[in-house]
């Protein structure tokens, strides 16, 4: 979709209102108003605070105060997605059903490679997405101001003109979220960060760990995605995985497909030769990859076990037990607690996060690499981790 050039078409349409009588012209007027609404909404900025206030007012039944609008596109109805279930996230009756996706999009203004990855991810996601008429796809971006403008440009370029579903975009300021996260994740950063000043040392890369405390309570479920992805199926189908969570499960995540954690847990494995920790599937526990994560925020909020695992003393105890020192942020934390409490996790099929990186095959683990890397079935999401090219269509 190209950029809209101004409000002149809207003004002309409104000027003709008094003269238009026929049903045909009324339809033209409605179309013009829709264009005007999209231009107005596309130029707005909604902050995390204003979104929270609006959600709380809506749930309380009070009329929501005017807030800076989010980029929003309504394209009419669409045939029901296969296997789709109409579920109100508010617990009420029929009405709009929101589906939430979140992506990190920071330091993108002068990063052509990152913009190219985002273009591939968003183009494939939006091209294949199908939602019912009453469903809304909410795209959350965590970014600073410069990257926010880049994201807006990409979305105006990539939102298909005949999408057939409603799409809303919400931007969260990375600095604001970092301030909220730091007190929660400070203690774990030393165990799961590459070092001061490096990519994963920033608190924001532990967002998924504390998302349940950061997002408005009205958001019950959210899917967090990396940008180096390419979608091969309707993203609506991934939300159905929430229905397969067993009691006690709070996060859906795929296995790591390289012997990353065979390496990280080397000392624990040496001391415990019969352990499953770090071993390849299906018998082993290879750890997790955070490129695609389903976060049941309400279950995370209600889990006493998960709350305890966030305590600094608990993190230290497990890190000492497993001699754990990682550099992959939230992925390391989930992997470590998953060794101790696997029932917290719903394991996604590898086809939902088909990782392509083969770095560890060439760095000491060629003899066991295929046992980790093997993935059978039709790929639904490709993950071009460590800058690995993704197959063309």
Swiss-Prot record:
Segments for region (Interaction with target proteins): 263-266
Protein's name in the database: Xyloside xylosyltransferase 1
Enzyme Commission number, as recorded: 2.4.2.62
Topology versus the membrane: Single-pass type II membrane protein
Catalytic activity: 3-O-[alpha-D-xylosyl-(1->3)-beta-D-glucosyl]-L-seryl-[EGF-like domain protein] + UDP-alpha-D-xylose = 3-O-[alpha-D-xylosyl-(1->3)-alpha-D-xylosyl-(1->3)-beta-D-glucosyl]-L-seryl-[EGF-like domain protein] + UDP + H(+)
The encoding gene: XXYLT1
Top EC class of this enzyme: transferase
Subcellular location: Endoplasmic reticulum membrane
Keywords: Disulfide bond, Endoplasmic reticulum, Glycosyltransferase, Magnesium, Manganese, Membrane, Metal-binding, Signal-anchor, Transferase, Transmembrane, Transmembrane helix
Binding site for a glycoprotein: 331, 360, 385
Subunit: Homodimer. Dimer formation may be essential for the retention in endoplasmic reticulum.
Cytoplasmic face residues: 1-23
Binding, UDP-alpha-D-xylose: 104-106, 227, 290, 328, 331
Record-level Gene Ontology MF annotations: magnesium ion binding; manganese ion binding; UDP-xylosyltransferase activity; xylosyl alpha-1,3-xylosyltransferase activity
Location (main, coarse): endoplasmic reticulum
Cofactors required: Mg(2+); Mn(2+)
InterPro entries according to UniProt: Glyco_trans_8, Nucleotide-diphossugar_trans, XXLT1
Entry note: cofactor: Has the highest in vitro activity with 20 mM Mn(2+), a concentration entirely out of the physiological range. Can also utilize Mg(2+), suggesting this may be the physiological cofactor.
Record topological domains on the Lumenal side: 45-393
BP-aspect Gene Ontology terms: O-glycan processing
Binding site residues for Mn(2+): 226, 228, 383
SUPFAM superfamilies: Nucleotide-diphospho-sugar transferases
pH-activity dependence text: Optimum pH is 7.2.
């Amino acid at each position: 979709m190209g950029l809209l050039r101004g409000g002149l078409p809207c003004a002309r349409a409104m000027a003709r209102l008094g003269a238009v009588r026929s049903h045909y012209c009324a339809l033209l007027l409605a179309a013009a108003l829709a264009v005007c609404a999209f231009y107005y909404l596309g130029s707005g900025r909604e902050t995390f605070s204003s979104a929270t206030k609006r959600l709380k007012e809506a749930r309380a039944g009070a009329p929501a105060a005017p807030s800076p609008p989010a980029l929003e596109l309504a394209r009419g109805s669409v045939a029901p997605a296969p296997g789709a279930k109409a579920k109100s996230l508010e617990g009420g009756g029929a009405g709009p059903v929101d589906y939430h996706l979140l992506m990190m999009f920071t330091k993108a203004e002068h990063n052509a490679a990152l913009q190219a990855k985002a273009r591939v991810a968003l183009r494939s996601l939006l091209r294949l997405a199908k939602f019912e008429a009453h469903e809304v796809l909410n795209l959350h971006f965590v970014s600073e101001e410069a990257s926010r403008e880049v994201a807006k440009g990409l979305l105006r370029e990539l939102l298909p003109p005949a999408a057939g579903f409603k799409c809303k975009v919400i931007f969260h300021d990375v600095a604001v979220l970092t301030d909220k996260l730091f007190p929660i994740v400070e203690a774990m950063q030393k165990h799961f960060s590459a070092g001061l000043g490096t990519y994963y040392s920033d608190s924001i890369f532990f967002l998924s760990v504390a998302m349940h405390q950061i997002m408005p309570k009205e958001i019950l479920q959210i899917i967090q995605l990396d940008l180096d992805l390419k979608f091969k199926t309707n993203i609506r189908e991934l939300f159905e995985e929430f229905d397969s969570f067993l009691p006690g499960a709070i996060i859906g995540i795929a296995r790591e497909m390289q012997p990353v954690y065979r390496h990280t847990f080397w000392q624990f494995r040496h001391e415990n030769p019969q352990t499953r920790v770090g071993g390849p599937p299906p018998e082993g526990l290879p750890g997790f990859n955070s490129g695609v994560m389903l976060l049941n925020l309400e279950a995370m909020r209600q889990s006493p076990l998960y709350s305890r695992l966030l305590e600094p003393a608990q993190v230290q105890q497990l890190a000492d037990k497993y001699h754990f020192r990682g550099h992959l942020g939230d992925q390391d934390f989930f992997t470590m607690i998953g060794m101790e409490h696997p029932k917290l996790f719903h394991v996604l099929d590898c086809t939902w996060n088909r990782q392509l990186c083969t770095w560890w095959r060439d760095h000491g683990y060629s003899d066991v690499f295929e046992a980790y890397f093997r993935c059978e079935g039709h790929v639904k999401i490709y993950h071009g981790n460590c800058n690995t090219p993704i197959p063309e269509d």
